[in-house]
Amino acid sequence: MKDLVAKRYVKALVDGRDLNSVALISEKLNEVSKAFKSDKFNSILSSSDINEVEKTKFILSMIDKADKSLENFIKLLGEKRRLDIIPEIAFELKTQIAKM
């Protein structure tokens, strides 16, 4: 299920962008997806004591020099309560780049 949702987000992310822009976004999302391997990180994201806005800000703080489109994308994921699919999105984005 997460894979299907991730594919839709990747399609929206890739449409209208050149390979260099997509590769840069992929690099940034890969940095964040590595954090999902940490139990502490996952406990923060799954905590009901922390609202989605704060979780989104937390993830954005991990991304060095995020461009506005990536920042808006992460905010959208936060609003839709989909921050947990960032690793799937990063994987699908790598797959999509290989096809470009």
Regions found by a protein language model. Name each.
Residues 1-100:
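Elongated, mostly alpha-helical coiled-coil "stalk/stator" tethers of large membrane protein machines
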